[in-house]
C-alpha cells in the first residue's frame, strides 16, 4: 500500500510504500548512491575516439555538498569504471567512490564497517537490479521515478524526479528532513 507525503519547499508529494522501517529511531549518517541511472540519466556518450562522457545535474551536486556539510558520509558505488565519475566525485568531496562493482553488497558492508555504522544508519538510492542489496539493507531507501520495476519494489520510496534530473537532490533533501536538518514544509492550497 502506498501513502503520500510532502517534503521540501516544492510541496511535491512522493509515493511512500508502507514497510516497517529498520531505522528504529536512528539518524541517517551515511548516503549510498548508485551512479548511472541515479546521478546520471543512465545514458553514456562515447565519442569516436572512445572518450566517454556523462552528464551530472548541478542541483544534485549542490545537494551532495549540502549533505556533506550536514555531516553525512557520502559513498558512490558504481558497476562501471569511469574517469568522469571519479572527477565528479572528487570535485564534490565524496568520501568514497567505488567503481567496477557489479555486486554492491560487499562494498556497502565494507564501508559500513569502516565508518562504524549500522545499516539502519544508512540511506541508499539505486535504479536497477545490481542496487537491490543496498536498497534492501539500508535503513532508508529510495529510487528515481524512472527506476526498473525491481528497484521500485525494493525501495521504500519512489521519488518524483528521474535519475540525472534531480532524483539525488530530492533523496538528499528527504534524508535531511528525516534527520531533522531540514524542516518539512507543506504548500498551502
Describe each PLM feature range.
Residues 46, 50-57, 90-92, 96-98, ...:
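Mg2+-dependent phosphoryl-transfer enzymes with acidic/Ser/Thr/Gly-rich catalytic loops
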Residues 3-7, 15-106, 189:
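Alpha-helical substrate-recognition element adjacent to the catalytic core
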Amino acid at each position: 500500500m502506498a501513502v503520500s507525503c510532502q517534503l521540501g519547499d516544492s510541496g511535491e508529494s512522493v509515493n511512500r510504500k508502507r514497510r516497517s522501517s529498520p531505522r528504529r529511531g536512528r539518524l541517517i549518517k551515511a548516503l549510498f548512491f548508485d551512479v548511472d541511472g541515479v546521478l546520471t540519466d543512465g545514458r553514456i556518450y562515447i565519442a569516436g575516439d572512445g572518450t566517454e562522457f556523462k552528464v551530472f545535474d548541478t542541483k544534485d551536486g549542490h545537494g551532495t555538498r549540502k549533505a556533506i556539510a550536514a555531516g553525512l558520509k557520502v559513498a558512490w558505488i558504481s558497476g562501471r569504471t569511469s574517469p568522469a565519475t571519479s572527477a565528479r566525485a572528487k570535485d564534490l568531496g565524496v568520501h568514497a567512490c567505488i567503481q567496477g562493482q557489479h555486486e554492491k553488497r560487499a562494498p556497502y558492508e565494507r564501508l559500513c564497517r569502516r565508518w562504524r555504522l549500522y545499516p539502519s544508519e544508512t540511506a541508499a538510492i539505486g535504479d536497477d537490479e545490481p542496487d537491490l542489496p543496498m536498497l534492501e539493507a539500508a535503513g532508508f531507501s529510495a529510487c528515481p521515478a524512472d527506476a526498473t520495476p525491481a528497484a521500485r519494489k525494493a525501495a521504500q520510496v519512489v521519488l518524483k524526479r528521474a535519475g540525472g534530473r534531480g532524483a539525488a537532490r530530492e533523496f538528499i533533501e528527504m534524508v535531511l528532513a528525516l534527520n531533522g536538518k531540514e524542516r518539512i514544509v507543506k504548500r498551502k492550497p
